[in-house]
């Protein structure tokens, strides 16, 4: 790749440097790659920006209603080359077998899909009817799979705070494997309960909704994950921790959490999140760091991906504008996988078994009257009804 303006996320610089790729990895990154050119070398001349492939630090494929292969096909043209997925929705239905199916299909893709073993399936025991309940033995088994990067979001934060034996056993199995424990602290209480949660093992958290949340997570040694998904708009309210309070941006990560397929088609994926962070006042190179090297470092993969540097996986984006991020070309593991917004590679599927299909069983057929709330007799003008409140652009859990 000759003549490009390289975004160096290690030094936070733009450098007029060349890039040489061999066997799917960066072989040379520097001012003159001409000596790397042989008779069979493919040369790409590009005067625009050359940036690392984007990473989604926390997300659930199932929210899109797509399989991992189809999700990859949707997001690759938007520049996403690495995803850290928590398949806790399929775990609710199929348990460990379902997680393994998602894990296996993820490993087949032309981009990097790492799986976090779900920790809390079901997420609300006793309040939902599920097909399976994840246990500590399941977590210990999954930690041996090649694509497992850690433990998925620890949603049972009261269990962590109060020393629930199952939650502690799941985190212990993850720690023994030397992998990352994902967090989910969905409470405004930043006092003793939060301190206990941070001490329990979770290394990150994406449930923050305001500047104080982001600041406290970083101060307690956690990575603050700021999300922009289809329903989550939590970047703007937290990014002031960087842009105004001046906290070290290397401890912040961008993610989506949940994206509907319509969002992917109409608005994009991680390129949308980076654009949004920049529009909220973040320096473009800082925003890129939060969607590349910061994420890789958090999961122990800094020497493997997340930057354009020698030895790393050759995941690259060509873009003509560092703020708007139009994605002109996407390279993953040294091969062009998307060009001008269209995918140019295959995203293979596993052979999904019959057990993974038609899994919704409603029992007795329901009628509309069963969902009606009858008004009390006797001319009462006021009745108490249990409802679910709505918070605009948030979904506190």
Region locations from a protein language model:
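Active-site mouth loops of central-metabolism enzymes
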Residues: 55-67, 123-135, 203, 207
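Divalent-metal coordination cores built from histidine and acidic residues
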Residues: 69-180, 245-247
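Active-site beta-loop-alpha junctions enriched in small/polar residues
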Residues: 60-62, 88-90, 118-123, 153-157, ...
